[in-house]
Amino acid sequence: MSKRMMILAMASMLISHAALAQKVAVKTNLLYDATTTINLGAEVALAPKWTLDLSGNYNGWTFSDNKKWKHWLVQPELRYWPCNKMMGHFFGLHALGGRYNVGNVDVDMNLLGTDFSQLKDYRYEGWAVGAGLAYGYAWTLAKHWNLEAEIGIGWAYTRYDKYECQSCGQKVADDEGHHYVGPTKAAINLVYVF
């Protein structure tokens, strides 16, 4: 191999290694971690100011007194970074999809036509899809570590079966539909940037 080819090969390896900087990140949402929900996210750079974030989570546990917030959820998000990707302010457009089995949860809240207090007396099993807009900010903690905060609002459509009690009751509604408008994303992410 000629000296020129060797230099060219080494230069291309250095350039490709430098090109990986701020191109890929993995993350965990600390809010989901606090609720025992297993979650993992990844983000890849698409262009100088655009990234694609994909997060997924799973909670398959039944807690004491038969409380359950069982679900799996996938949330892809296209992000725009006004300054540098994976640092500072960002705006996102996200979608969501998943399944759930929720009951015996005491949440006394009525939000824009959704009565969450019914989760105490009934169990709901179904699926949901939706979309929303988000705003967030990423702080650099160290060379490879970031902390991200994000909030999103949007719409979700769900279809569900409704049961009388939390685990064994008779079905009282079959294949009902509901439109939800409100928060669709909340995250405090611990991020490792490659």
Predicted regions and their residues:
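Repeated loop/turn-to-beta-strand initiation elements of outer-membrane beta-barrel proteins
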Residues: 24, 50-52, 86, 144-147
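Solvent-exposed loop/turn segments connecting transmembrane beta-strands
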Residues: 26-41, 59-70, 85
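Membrane-embedded beta-strand positions of outer-membrane beta-barrel proteins
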Residues: 26-28, 42, 54-56, 76, ...
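Flexible, solvent-exposed loop segments that connect beta-strands
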Residues: 58-71, 99-127, 159-179
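Residues that define the transmembrane beta-barrel architecture of outer-membrane proteins
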Residues: 22, 34-36, 68-74, 87, ...
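Outer-membrane beta-barrel channels and translocator barrels
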Residues: 35, 47-49, 83-87, 140-142
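Transmembrane beta-strands of outer-membrane beta-barrel pores
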Residues: 30-34, 56-62, 80-82, 95-101, ...
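Outer-membrane beta-barrel "beta-signal"
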Residues: 180-194
